[in-house]
Amino acid sequence: MIDAEKNNSPLDLSYLRDMSGDSAEFMIEMIDMFKLQTPLYIADLEQSIVAQEWDKAAGFAHKIKPTLSYVGREDARGHLQLIENSARDLKDLSDMPKNFQEFSDFVQILYRQLDEAKAELEKRL
């Protein structure tokens, strides 16, 4: 589940750091790509939930999950796993709108954290 304490901490970008050989330029590109693609994936997830297309919802949640690990928010990955499992197994579907809204609200916090991380990385260029 989403760990609210991590919302006010700097992101753990160790995965990106390792993957990029500590290249600030590459990490900035990955952050920019995340911020460009994620809203599209989230919109697809929301549309599938509203339309009650549970197979699609499970697929979109699954697609977003790994990207959260890249930016150091493994905790939110667990929240998406809950959404994916509920959609795939057709369980607790009445909780789906609430669970989606919690994730959507979290993403706004994550974007702020990514902006802060990017600003720190830009100092290294």
Residue spans for each PLM region:
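Amphipathic, coiled-coil-like alpha-helical segments
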Residues: 2-9, 35, 67-82, 89-125
